């Protein structure tokens, strides 16, 4: 069974799909459980007689009652009774499987009057576990004894615990074994001797490569064919190109690739493949442990593997691949050595000890703008004896005692000097190929120190010049310099000791800079504490538990130093294939071995099948509107330079309890009414068990005499952070009535605007001030229609829960032409909106109510959303950005260069944006949708959804109409809100918007760079577009702007702007009560870790404090950032936010 729980309460009050009765063979009413069942479902005893050791299903009074007859141990032997008890439970399990019952309430059989006077709780419980493990039902065990409850709970806990066989073994379930030459060696979570041998390497730069390699192995089941494709992938071929070569359309879910295929230097690990691919390598070497087809593959050379790994569970500890040997005494003790290596080749390559050369360095300065910082692969240690060469000024971090700075600002003339070497280590060096150049690592200079401290990342310094290194062969290497003093005499350095390596030099030369041409991993970028389930798709993120609102794959960045236009290419999706037989097979596997991995595989297949069925249903329902896919208009999208930010320096406390206390101290100092807020849990939730109530929009009546029982049981963890944020609303009658009573829509308009004239002016302003004037004719000639591809793409991209909801809604589907598009449903929003402040303690939390559109309208028409977004991005001016399909990193790349200290930024906050959209704005939206090319047939449907709303006054039956307003949760809500947001900015700002270097819009949120408000802006909004607007003038670095739940801050170290989450909002959210049994804390912790890493950037710390003090007028914000970093460090720390479980209404006494 997926889950076992125990409850100490009356079984007749259960909420499960079926109940098991501890019956007797005659089918008559007895005592205990039998009497409770008879009292609640009296008809269930008709024809209930069944022999001992069997069970019988009776459906009565709307309930599935399973009568199971256990043995009476007073009348049978122990062995016979034990057999019959097991048989009774097996019979119950058989009925559950045959009837597809998903949850069952069950007592322990033969533990009461049939127990023969002995304690048979554990005996009965073991048989129950054995039988129920073969079912797919959630099992709730009911008892009335406190000692029994404790025993059963301990037994359930033991089933989920991990037992250590030996005391010597340390439990490291998330340890991953990596290649000895991997850069992950020594980092937490990775080992060269122990751990899992298959992983997607989540949280590293090699994750995407690992996922791609796993997909290739799935597309080509034959190992040699898959390896051939992996070689082509390493040589630069794209995944799309590889997928098109696959002979079959669909493939199974992938499994993680090997992390250690072998121990030789040519092991084709995800890390090596990633580096080869990143360096645009044209020829690679693979070893024999990576089998390939017999024929030759261009650019791939095969060698014999000299260190085959036999996968044994007890791996001997490996000898370090490096052995340091003493060097011969140098005659020039005061000369500096800078190493260059001749022998290189694969991503694993190390310098050979026979190829070290001594270089004499002469400084000579050249001035020009550098490209990107050079790779820093091997550190040449240079000890300075005569003078301190370099001084780094204006450092924003504590200076470490050992600082390493690249010597770039020099033209280095290399003279080869023979190194004294014993014949034991002298190896022949193959002649270098003419086409390639010897790589020279970037030399570094080290300041000598008498003591050691932990290293601190050095800040980036703006570069002003470039230099080159010239070898005796006349080959130049460009190096990008950092801030460096010009030297007037040669630098004398000491030769580094040679290193013995356990392999032969490799006969391949790699271009300088081959190793790391992409940006470096910054300290704090990777969370090595991530919990990996062991397969893709293990986490389905929600907004609170995953990376925030802007979470997508980065698609708007590139490694070039300037903005470039690219042809917009749709990400290819693979339609789900229906395979019910495989779903049943995976379900059976999961039942036999109920591990997380098996459960995940089964759920993935189940969701795929659901999606396939949904697509067929929707295509069938929309067939009168369905058309062939027309040729898409090519559009272009800008990509921006990948920004560089200062490194994160961890600043946290040791004790998480101190961190919680620091959060509460901050709240007490800045929000005293919040910290001291007290509320009684059992306030007034009794209205949800009322009989005979009459509920209307404006009143509710009931009879207090008809109160039947306590409210439903509600349990939650008492929050330790005292931010007094209420938990989500319970779906009780009282709250639903409050919601129904609250929804007093704006039934009268403030005044009648000239609807048509206003809409035409809105559209003209939009096209004049926010658009580039292209594409309108092409859009008109190529209308957007519902196509098979639209529907398929939309459904394929749905996450599991959304797919399940749509699957339920499309059952007995109404055709699109019969969907009532003008209908909307008043729905209750369960979550309480969290805003930092005291409002939530000064008044009772109000139930938020939304007007949801007809679900089927959303299901049919969501398919056109992607094409609408693509077209809108194509027509908008290059300075205006919408955040659709964009990651947080993409947004950072867009704003990085534009937002500088002292720049003015305009924020506008529109009150009740959805409700304020009247007829003129609805018409504006329809006209713009028509201009973007939406087909006339679809426009008719959308017009019905956007138009006037018809309502009925329930007490009198009076029908009335009121003006249009946007319905939340509709198929185009976010798109149209964003469109109208830009329209309003165009009407009010006009040329100021056009001339702004950067403006961003999403929904009702916007920021416009370089604009200051004037006294008429708010009045124009009120009179021209009927919107009540609050205008905020922000200034970078003084009062930083706020957008999308975060601040736009300026990184003082790198000179780039970025958006970071609001720490105060995050702190308030940590005080939200969590329902008992929630299992998403690891996701929440990881999401918080990502945010704390950004807050810890060296160049942002002071900026963040300015932002919080200017926006919220609070002090001591450094303490809460430090406290949240402590809580995010580990799951154990994060759990300190959760106090004891509070039970309301009917919990354990």
From Swiss-Prot:
Determine the domain of life of the protein's source.
Answer: Viruses
Q: Which residues bind Zn(2+)?
A: 262, 264, 287, 305
> Species lineage, top-down?
Viruses, Riboviria, Orthornavirae, Kitrinoviricota, Alsuviricetes
Q: Which reaction does it catalyse?
A: RNA(n) + a ribonucleoside 5'-triphosphate = RNA(n+1) + diphosphate; 4-O-(ADP-D-ribosyl)-L-aspartyl-[protein] + H2O = L-aspartyl-[protein] + ADP-D-ribose + H(+); 5-O-(ADP-D-ribosyl)-L-glutamyl-[protein] + H2O = L-glutamyl-[protein] + ADP-D-ribose + H(+); RNA(n) + ATP = RNA(n)-3'-adenine ribonucleotide + diphosphate
| Cellular component aspect of the GO annotation | host cell cytoplasmic vesicle membrane; membrane
Q: How is the cofactor bound?
A: For nsP4 adenylyltransferase activity; Mn(2+) supports catalysis at 60% of the levels observed with Mg(2+). For nsP4 RNA-directed RNA polymerase activity.
Cite the position(s) of the site with description Cleavage.
Answer: 538-539
| Keyword terms | Host cytoplasmic vesicle, Host membrane, Hydrolase, Membrane, Metal-binding, Nucleotide-binding, Nucleotidyltransferase, Phosphoprotein, RNA-binding, RNA-directed RNA polymerase, Transferase, Ubl conjugation, Viral RNA replication, Zinc
Q: Which residues carry this modification: Phosphothreonine?
A: 344
Q: Which residues form the RdRp catalytic domain?
A: 903-1018
A further note on this protein reads: Viral replication produces dsRNA in the late phase of infection, resulting in a strong activation of host EIF2AK2/PKR, leading to almost complete phosphorylation of EIF2A. This inactivates completely cellular translation initiation, resulting shutoff of host proteins synthesis. However, phosphorylation of EIF2A is probably not the only mechanism responsible for the host translation shutoff. The viral translation can still occur normally because it relies on a hairpin structure in the coding region of sgRNA and is EIF2A-, EIF2D-, EIF4G- EIF4A-independent. The genome codes for P123, but readthrough of a terminator codon UGA occurs between the codons for Phe-531 and Leu-533 giving rise to P1234. P1234 is cleaved quickly by nsP2 into P123' and nsP4. Further processing of p123' gives nsP1, nsP2 and nsP3' which is 6 amino acids longer than nsP3 since the cleavage site is after the readthrough. This unusual molecular mechanism ensures that few nsP4 are produced compared to other non-structural proteins. Mutant viruses with no alternative termination site grow significantly slower than wild-type virus.
Origin species:
Ross river virus (strain T48)
Name of this chain's protein: Polyprotein nsP1234
Please report the stretch or stretches of sequence annotated as the Macro domain: 1-160
């Amino acid at each position: 069974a997926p889950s076992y729980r125990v409850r100490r309460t009356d079984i007749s009050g259960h909420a499960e799909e079926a109940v098991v009765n501890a019956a007797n063979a005659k089918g008559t009413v007895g005592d205990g459980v039998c009497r409770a069942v008879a009292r609640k479902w009296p008809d269930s005893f008709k024809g209930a007689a069944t022999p001992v050791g069997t069970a019988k299903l009776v459906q009565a009074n709307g309930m599935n009652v399973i009568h199971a007859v256990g043995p009476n141990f007073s009348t049978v032997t122990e062995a016979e009774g034990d057999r019959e008890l097991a048989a009774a439970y097996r019979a119950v399990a058989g009925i559950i499987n045959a009837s597809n019952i998903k949850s069952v309430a069950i007592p322990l059989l033969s533990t009461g009057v049939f127990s023969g006077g002995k304690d048979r709780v554990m005996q009965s419980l073991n048989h129950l576990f054995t039988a129920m493990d073969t079912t797919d039902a959630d099992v709730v065990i009911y008892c009335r004894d406190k000692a029994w409850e404790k025993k059963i709970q301990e037994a359930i806990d033991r089933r989920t615990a991990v037992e250590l066989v030996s005391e010597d073994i340390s439990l490291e379930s998330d340890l991953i074994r990596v290649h000895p030459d991997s850069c992950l060696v020594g980092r937490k979570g990775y080992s060269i001797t122990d751990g899992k041998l298959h992983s997607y390497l989540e949280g590293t730069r090699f994750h995407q490569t690992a996922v791609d390699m796993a997909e290739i192995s799935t597309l080509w089941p034959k190992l040699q064919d898959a390896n051939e494709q992996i070689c082509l992938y390493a040589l630069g071929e794209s995944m799309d190109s590889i997928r098109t070569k696959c002979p079959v359309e669909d493939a199974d879910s992938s499994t993680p690739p090997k992390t250690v295929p072998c121990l030789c230097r040519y092991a084709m690990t995800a890390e090596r493949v990633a580096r080869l691919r990143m360096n645009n390598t044209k020829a690679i070497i693979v070893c024999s442990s990576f089998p390939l087809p017999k024929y030759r593959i261009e650019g791939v050379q095969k060698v014999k593997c000299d260190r085959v790994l036999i996968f044994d569970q007890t791996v001997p500890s490996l000898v370090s691949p490096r052995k340091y040997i003493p060097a011969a005494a140098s005659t020039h003790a005061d000369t500096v050595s800078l190493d260059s290596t001749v022998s290189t080749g694969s991503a694993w390559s190390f310098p050979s000890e026979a190829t070290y050369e001594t270089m004499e360095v002469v400084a000579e300065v050249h001035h020009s703008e550098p490209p990107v910082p050079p790779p820093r692969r091997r550190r040449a240690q240079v000890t300075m004896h005569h003078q301190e060469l370099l001084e780094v000024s204006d450092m924003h971090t504590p200076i470490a005692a050992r600082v390493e700075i690249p010597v770039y600002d020099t033209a280095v003339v290399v003279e080869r000097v023979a190194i004294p070497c014993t014949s034991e280590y002298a190896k022949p060096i193959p002649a270098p190929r003419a086409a390639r150049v010897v790589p020279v690592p970037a030399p570094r200079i080290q300041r000598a120190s008498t003591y050691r401290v932990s290293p601190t990342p050095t800040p980036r310094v703006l570069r002003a010049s470039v230099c080159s290194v010239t070898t005796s062969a006349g080959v130049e290497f460009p190096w990008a310099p950092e801030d460096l003093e010009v030297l007037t005499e040669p630098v004398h350095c000491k030769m580094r000791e040679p290193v013995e390596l356990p392999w032969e030099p490799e006969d391949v030369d790699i271009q300088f800079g081959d190793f790391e041409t992409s940006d470096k991993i910054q300290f704090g970028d990777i969370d090595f504490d991530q919990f990996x389930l062991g397969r893709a798709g293990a986490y389905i993120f929600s907004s609170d538990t995953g990376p925030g609102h802007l979470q997508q794959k980065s698609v708007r960045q590139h490694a070039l130093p300037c903005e470039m236009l690219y042809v917009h290419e749709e990400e290819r999706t693979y339609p789900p294939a229906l395979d019910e037989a495989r779903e049943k097979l995976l379900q059976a596997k999961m039942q036999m071995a109920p591990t997380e991995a098996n459960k995940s595989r089964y759920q993935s297949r189940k969701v795929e099948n659901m999606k396939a069925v949904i697509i067929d249903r929707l295509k069938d329902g929309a067939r009168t509107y369905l058309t062939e896919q027309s040729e898409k208009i090519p559009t272009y999208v800008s990509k921006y330079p990948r920004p560089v930010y200062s490194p994160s320096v961890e600043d946290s406390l040791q004790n998480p309890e101190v961190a919680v206390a620091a959060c509460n101290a901050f709240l007490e100092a800045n929000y005293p009414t919040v910290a001291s807020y007290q509320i009684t849990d059992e306030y007034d939730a009794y209205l949800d068990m009322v009989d005979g109530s009459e509920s209307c929009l404006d009143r509710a009546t009931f009879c207090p005499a008809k109160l039947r029982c306590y409210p439903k049981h509600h349990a939650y963890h008492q929050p330790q952070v005292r931010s007094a944020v209420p938990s989500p609303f319970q779906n009780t009658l009282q709250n639903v009535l409050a919601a129904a009573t609250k929804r007093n829509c704006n039934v009268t308009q403030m005044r009648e605007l000239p609807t048509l004239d206003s809409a035409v002016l809105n559209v003209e302003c939009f096209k004049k001030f926010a658009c580039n004037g292209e594409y309108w004719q092409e859009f008109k000639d190529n209308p957007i229609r519902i196509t098979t591809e639209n529907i398929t793409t939309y459904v394929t991209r749905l996450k599991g829960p959304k797919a399940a909801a749509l699957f339920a809604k499309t059952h007995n589907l109404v055709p699109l032409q019969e969907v009532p598009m003008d209908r909307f449903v008043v729905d209750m929003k369960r979550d309480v909106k969290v805003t930092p402040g005291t409002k939530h303690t000064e008044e009772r939390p109000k139930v938020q109510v939304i007007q949801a559109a007809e679900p089927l309208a959303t299901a049919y028409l969501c398919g056109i959303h992607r094409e609408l977004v693509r077209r809108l991005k194509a027509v908008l001016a290059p300075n205006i950005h919408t955040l659709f399909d964009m990651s947080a990193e993409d947004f950072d790349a867009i704003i990085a260069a534009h937002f500088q200290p002292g720049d003015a930024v305009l924020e506008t906050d529109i009150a009740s944006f959805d409700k304020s959209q009247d007829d003129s704005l609805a018409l504006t939206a329809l006209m713009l949708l028509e201009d973007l090319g939406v087909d006339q047939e679809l426009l008719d449907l959308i017009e019905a959804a956007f138009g006037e709303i018809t309502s009925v006054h329930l007490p009198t039956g009076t029908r009335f109409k009121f003006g249009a307003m946007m319905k939340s949760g509709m198929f185009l809500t976010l798109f149209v809100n964003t469109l109208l947001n830009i329209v309003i900015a165009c009407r009010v700002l006009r040329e100021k918007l056009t001339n702004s270097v950067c403006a961003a819009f999403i929904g009702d949120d916007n920021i416009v760079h370089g604009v200051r408000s004037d006294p008429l802006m708010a009045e124009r909004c009120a009179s021209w577009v009927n919107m009540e607007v609050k205008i905020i003038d922000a200034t970078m670095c003084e009062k930083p702007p706020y957008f999308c739940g975060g601040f736009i801050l300026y990184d003082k170290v790198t000179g780039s702007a970025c958006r970071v989450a609001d720490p105060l909002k995050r702190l308030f959210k940590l005080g939200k009560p969590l329902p008992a049994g929630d299992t998403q804390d690891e996701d929440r912790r990881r999401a918080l870790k990502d945010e704390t890493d950004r807050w810890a950037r060296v160049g942002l710390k002071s900026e963040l404090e300015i932002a919080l003090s200017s926006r919220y007028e609070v002090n001591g914000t450094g303490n809460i950032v430090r406290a949240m970093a402590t809580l995010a460090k580990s799951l154990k720390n994060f759990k300190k936010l959760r106090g004891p479980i509070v039970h309301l209404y009917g919990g354990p006494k």
